[in-house]
């Protein structure tokens, strides 16, 4: 199964790394998609984020990194022929937010699933 893990990764955190590590053990292929979040002020340029994330994830043989700034996540899932989107959940606020996004994605394409992984408490706020 191939999954997409989208995010702004500005910067990539220990929480992201933990989730990606766990996902790499559960799924055949994980595509980390660096996207633009217009509601956040970026610390790094897209190219810098791409370099940092690619370097951080180089030890995972089944994880790839893609820089896609201007497309809906659901379209990226289709572009990479992925089976699902993975998201991390730290708390109830994250759950509510991710549920709303998952429901919208389901309306856009009923075949795409969203799979959530609960954050490891040791890295959920790092």
PLM features: what roles do these ranges have?
Residues 1-126:
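Nucleotidyltransferase catalytic core that binds NTPs
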């Amino acid at each position: 199964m191939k999954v997409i893990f989208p995010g702004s990764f500005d910067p990539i955190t220990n929480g992201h790394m933990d989730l990606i590590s766990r996902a790499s053990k559960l799924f055949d292929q994980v595509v980390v998609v660096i996207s633009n979040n217009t509601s956040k002020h970026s610390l790094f340029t897209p190219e810098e984020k791409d370099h940092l994330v690619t370097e951080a994830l180089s030890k995972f043989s089944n994880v790839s990194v893609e820089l896609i700034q201007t497309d809906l996540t659901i379209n990226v899932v289709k572009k990479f022929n992925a089976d699902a989107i993975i998201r991390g959940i730290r708390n109830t606020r994250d759950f509510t937010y991710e549920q709303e996004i998952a429901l919208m994605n389901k309306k856009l394409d009923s075949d795409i699933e969203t799979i959530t992984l609960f954050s490891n408490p040791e890295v959920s706020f790092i």
